[in-house]
Amino acid sequence: MKKIDLNADIAEGFPFDESLLQLLSSANIACGLHAGGAKEMQSAVKFAKENKVRIGAHPSFPDRENFGRTAMALSSQELIAHLRYQLGALKAICDGEGAVISYVKPHGALYNQAAKDEKIARVIAQTVYQFDPHLKLMGLAGSLMLCIAEEEKLQTISEVFADRHYMPDGSLVPRSQPNAMVESDKEAIQQVLQMVTKGQVNAIDGSLVPVKAESICLHGDNQHSLQFAKRIVEELEKNHIKITA
């Protein structure tokens, strides 16, 4: 039986966390610098533990104004400090709840920059390794960040997206472009099954891009997204694909 991990961003202030955590195998918990805060983090950790969902840290640039989606030119030392701050905050909450962090997935602009920028990718990988060498680093399948992480002796998780279109080079179509998102549930489900069962995805130019699908990112920031997440779970189970971290 094929297996796949399902992850989503949690503790960002949306009202669907508890419902979403009943569908997921992994939760990317926001660490307060792009959204959410201590209260949301603690609730998310509790819910994740109750539902036996793997916990991941979801650090970002310090950018609450733009939800962490704006690229920032931080020095290496500034980025290290912000990463340590966020990882440390989530670890403290996990320690208090008897839970553990298993992986790190950068958020938004930090995720996208690290996928292509060696300097940023290496700072992230080295900071994570120094914080806890047993943590895994989750990132875009085939990205530079995952290659750098492996060089830095970190285990990695290759991630694919249910609701994003892909460029021919395997990167995501930028949100600034009108065709960035997969709007149709039917198309998104077809894309998920193609990535999980065949290891490939159709790029916007029609070419086939090979992808290593170890975890699927879902979004749950509105009611439609929650219903869509339920449909993804149903389709995976229907195709005998086990959801597990």
From Swiss-Prot:
Q: What class of enzyme is it?
A: hydrolase
Any one GO MF annotation of this record: 5-oxoprolinase (ATP-hydrolyzing) activity
- Record keywords, A-Z: ATP-binding, Hydrolase, Nucleotide-binding
Kindly indicate whether the keyword ATP-binding belongs to this entry: yes
In the record, biological process GO terms are: carbohydrate metabolic process
Per its record, the protein catalyses: 5-oxo-L-proline + ATP + 2 H2O = L-glutamate + ADP + phosphate + H(+)
Q: What is its EC number?
A: 3.5.2.9
SUPFAM superfamilies (UniProt xref): Glycoside hydrolase/deacetylase
Q: List, alphabetically, the Pfam families matched.
A: LamB_YcsF (PF03746)
The family assignment reads: Belongs to the LamB/PxpA family.
Q: How does it assemble?
A: Forms a complex composed of PxpA, PxpB and PxpC.
Q: What is the protein's known function? A: Catalyzes the cleavage of 5-oxoproline to form L-glutamate coupled to the hydrolysis of ATP to ADP and inorganic phosphate.
Could you tell me which NCBIfam families the record lists for this protein? PRK05406.1-3 (NF003814), PRK05406.1-4 (NF003815), PRK05406.1-5 (NF003816)
Protein name as it appears in the record? 5-oxoprolinase subunit A
